[in-house]
Amino acid sequence: VEKKDIVKTMTSSGTSGQSVSKIFLDKETASLQIKVLSKIMADFIGKKRLPMLIIDTKSIISNREKFSARTAGVLGFSIFGRDVEFALDEDMTINFKRVESFFNKYKSENILIFGFTFIIWKHFVLELEKVGRKFNLSKSVLFHGGGWKQLENQSVDNIEFKNRISNISNISNIHNYYGMVEQTGSIFVECEHGFFHASSFSDLIIRNHQTHSSELNGSQGLIQLLSVIPKSYPGHSILT
């Protein structure tokens, strides 16, 4: 696309510290990302916007032109919320007064909670456990993704994560999702049985790491991610 048509520049450092890649978005691609994400999320929360708590700091969305996968996630999911509140102060500690006020205000409603997995774990779950605090959020739905490598280093798997979340909040409606900044909008969301699902707008193929031929179900290999969204950059097919 022409430089004048670029409305957003997204950056990704990769999962293993590779050099930063830049993804340039024009208005059409940015719009498609939102439309597709909205279609996917409607299957889980309906079309009505919910009161929303983000387990992060407000400063994460300060730069609207250049932002990371974390920023893109917060901005993308926040369109499904209303009266959006941030749970953490700038020093990454829980603002209990703000959080309790939010929960009390919407105690009779369904609440949408969003955050990145490792941030939720380190700065919300562990902190609540440390101070012995619990919330009754049984009517809430939690979406989270990213940061699993850091949790695996602490021997925390998906089951342990969900159990500990449930213990401090009574949340049972928890959905992990997989996405990458190179294909923002094309997320794969975990169902209630623990399986990730491809939407009508994306797909994935497991390929042999030597021959690159497609593998049978249940096999391990390289992941080829496919998406119909990108218009302003070559992100339709990515091998990861």
What are these regions, as identified by a protein language model?
Residues 41-75:
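Conserved AMP-binding loop of ANL adenylate-forming enzymes
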Residues 11-14, 55-58, 118, 142-147:
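Short loop/turn segments at strand-loop or loop-helix junctions that form parts
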Residues 8, 23-31, 67-70, 128:
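"Short basic amphipathic alpha-helical interaction patches in structured regions
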Residues 1-6, 36-39:
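Flexible, low-complexity linker/hinge segments
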Residues 75-240:
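Active-site glycine/GP-rich loop and adjacent strand/helix microenvironment
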Residues 24-45:
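Conserved structural elements of the adenylate-forming
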Residues 6-23:
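Conserved adenylation A10 loop of the ANL superfamily
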Residues 20-23, 62-63, 150-154:
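A generic structural signal for short coil/turn motifs at secondary-structure boundaries
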